[in-house]
Design a protein with these regions (language model features):
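Basic/polar N-terminal segments that are highly enriched at the extreme N-terminus
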Residues: 1-3, 232-233
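GST-like domain detector, emphasizing the conserved glutathione-binding G-site
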Residues: 2-131
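Conserved alpha-helical elements of sugar-nucleotide-dependent glycosyltransferases
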Residues: 13-17, 189, 202
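Active-site-flanking alpha-helical
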Residues: 78, 169, 207
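GST-like fold's C-terminal all-alpha helical module
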Residues: 89, 96-199
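Exported/periplasmic ABC-transporter solute-binding proteins
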Residues: 203, 208-210
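Acidic/histidine-enriched, glycine/proline-rich intrinsically disordered or flexible terminal extensions
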Residues: 210-233
Length: 233
């Protein structure tokens, strides 16, 4: 029996943060699948494992506990798998990074596809994306990050902040060359950290599985098609 059951769509996107933390912690999980997600979402709230509006949703089988919302899931995994930093300040910073990462992917999909990308919208958005990248760069700098060593919040080994950051940027830059070039120019230490952490065996294996399972898909749907159109990918 696997340790967890994860409900997320058949794309990387937001669910990849949860998958990455599970993989990094060497935990096993099954994926509920798109049909099961729709059935839960369209069914009565009283029958949901936990009241939720949309995935990701994670069920801890051993604990018989279900939780939704990406930051809440990652906080739960961090606490129960002993992956959180020792101090309250660094735990708070870890969750800030997780929430920032969630905000970035909301931005990159125009709040889940409420609008579609046009060249003008992308041009107007570029400074904001560069600012997001600079936030990562400055966070790392304040905690001793260098181009060839160190971690986002310091310490001697990768933490959740590093795993989530590497997943955010590598999933995006692997699929969009222009964003890759932007990250290299705007936040070179973050780009280097992303490569180092993404090359960890567990995360490299997960990325390879995502390519096998989802191809080049990022978030899917019309919003991804419009993003690829403005980026020329």
């Amino acid at each position: 029996m696997t340790d967890y059951e994860l409900y997320y769509w058949s794309v990387p996107f937001r669910g990849q943060f949860v998958r990455a933390v599970l993989a990094y912690a060497d935990k096993t999980w099954t994926e509920g699948g798109d049909a099961a997600i729709l059935k839960l979402m369209e069914g009565p709230v009283r029958k949901m494992p936990v009241p939720f509006m949309g995935p990701p949703l994670l069920i801890d089988k051993k604990a018989d506990f279900a939780i939704a919302e990406t930051p809440a899931i990652i906080h739960y995994l961090g606490e129960t798998l002993d992956l959180m930093p020792a101090t309250a300040a660094l735990r708070a910073m870890t969750m800030k990074v997780v929430n920032d990462a969630s905000d970035v992917i909301d931005d990159i999909t125009l709040d889940g596809g409420r609008e579609m990308w046009t060249k003008k919208r992308w041009q107007d958005f570029t400074p904001r994306l560069e600012k997001w990248m600079s936030l990562w760069e400055e966070t790392g700098r304040r905690h001793g990050l260098k181009a060839d060593w160190g971690y986002l919040l310091g310490g001697g080994e990768p933490g959740i902040a590093d795993v989530v950051s590497a997943t955010l940027w590598s999933t995006m830059t692997d699929r969009f060359e222009k964003i890759d070039a932007m990250l290299e120019e705007t936040a070179p230490m973050t780009a280097a950290l992303t490569r180092r952490v993404a090359e960890l065996p567990s995360l490299a294996k997960l990325a390879a599985k995502a390519k096998q399972d989802y191809g080049d898909a990022y978030c899917g749907g019309q919003i991804e098609a419009s993003l690829r159109k403005v980026l020329g990918d």
